[in-house]
Amino acid sequence: MSIYLIALLPVLGWGFMPIIANLRKSTPEEQLLGTSISALLFAFILFWILSPEITVLSFIVSFVSGIFWSFGQLLQFKGIAASSVAKAMPISNGTQLVGATLFAVLVFQEWQTVTAVIIGVVAVILILIGVVMTGFQKRGNHITESVSFHVYGIVILSSFFLTLYVVTNQLFDVTGFSIILPQAIGMLTCAIGINLAKKTAISRKNVTFNLMTGLSWSIANLGMFLATAVLGVATSFSISQACVIVATIGGILIFKQKKSPLEWTFILSGILLIMVGVVFLSLLK
């Protein structure tokens, strides 16, 4: 029972992370810097407690994956700033799932059977349909797509980098808690570089506030590590993706976005399709 509660940490942590980041009007760069600082502090504490062995290879690979995360997370924050948490996060989650799936098929040559291909293709289609449905908005007597191509472009590019962040360690077979510290160092190094390149004043209050964003992300990350060790990749992966429910519905309610009954129907149906697609993908892991 307790391990399933731990498995809910990614759901809550990753679900509330973008909501926390947008409770205060910070720039995406400030959000990224605060999140990265908090992630590194959390990583140092875990390293001190667990003392995992870090090799030169695991450090370099994890450091690079942290850089990918920073670019991806910055673009995700930008996508949210250009739309909203409720609109951007289903696109982000859905396209990350599709990206990771394509990488698994093309690079790791998964889906070796016809059945696997059919299940995988159906899963991807369901996820993509679900993503589009969450962005529908009622205008007059018509339902239209409310998310602009500009936002789609930003979030999809974000998902490309976040997919690289996820698969880089897998590609080099770097696993376990040895990932966390060098990855966090890479995250903060890149975040500092991005803020220096911007050459504009940084609000210390905004960065400090976003330490909570980083704490939310770090708790989710730790929960995913612990849940995967006990429940396995398929189960923990499926549970963690419910974060899209928290981010989407939480974003609408907390930021008091008005939705008509028809819009709620499309949003909830879209989320349901995404989660069904996730379950199908978990069958292939």
Swiss-Prot record:
Molecular function per GO: carbohydrate transmembrane transporter activity
Family assignment from sequence similarity: Belongs to the GRP transporter (TC 2.A.7.5) family.
Phylogenetic classification of the source organism: Bacteria, Bacillati, Bacillota, Bacilli, Bacillales
One Pfam family it belongs to: Sugar_transport
The protein's name: Putative sugar uptake protein lin0444
InterPro entries: Sugar_transport
A Gene Ontology term for the protein's cellular component: plasma membrane
Keyword Transit peptide: no
CDD domains in the cross-refs: GRP (cd23110)
Membrane-spanning residues: 2-21, 31-50, 55-77, 111-133, 146-168, 172-194, 207-229, 233-255, 262-284
Keyword field: Cell membrane, Membrane, Sugar transport, Transmembrane, Transmembrane helix, Transport
UniProt-annotated location(s): Cell membrane
Keyword set includes Hydrolase: no
Membrane topology: Multi-pass membrane protein
